[in-house]
Amino acid sequence: GSILAMASRPHYNLNTREGLQEGAYHFAVQSLYEPGSTFKIVSVTSAVDSGKATFDTMINCTPYPVPGSRPVTDAPRSYGGLTVAGVLKKSSNPGAFRIALKSGWPTYKKYFDLYGFSSKTGIDLPGETNSQCQDGSNFVNFSRISFGYSLMVSPLQVAMAYAAIANDGVRMRPRLVDGIYVDDKNFQPSPPVEVCRGMSVKTARDLRNALFHVTDLDGTAKRARIEGYNVGGKTGTAHKVKPTGGYF
């Protein structure tokens, strides 16, 4: 749970204090964004960890018609069929929704909560903002939530969710302070705090392996590859809402 570095812009000028009001706002902790495809880990985890699918399960990734709304697509392309791991690798929207449907909203919401997306992280900073999410029992909302829209989360919540995957499925409380010195000499460490187990060790390790393949040369995150290192992650397209409605 230790945070080694965290930055936010714009910041204020330390010499003139110009921009102090704007610079005091910490975007990583206090701002909310639709996470986009980075959120597909919840769809995959809910189905795999609950036994409804494996990473080798084939998923139909053709457009999914949603009554009363626009279909879920990968426009302008269509992948046809992909494994669950392939859905992450290629970042298929209809694939993610069909995976989420295997678990259903109640189970999906359980893992949504276990990942920490329904509560503040508890970081030792003031003013932390909690997420906002549409009612997923509504089919249209569920179709959008499954690939990261119709909800808003903080960058820190997303970071801690991915940290749980790296930590074999255990979600930690984030902390900026390792400890304090009492009387300038006695160091009192701040112990790490486990919040909960969000998935089995096997699911976490298999998911981690799938995220490594997202950086393959035919994955969506190939530019994140670093020679000599195993790099895992998930691409995502964040849309910002216009004040007048719609997206930038």
What residue spans do the PLM features occupy?
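Beta-lactam-recognizing serine transpeptidase/beta-lactamase-like catalytic domain environment
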Residues: 2-37, 42-248
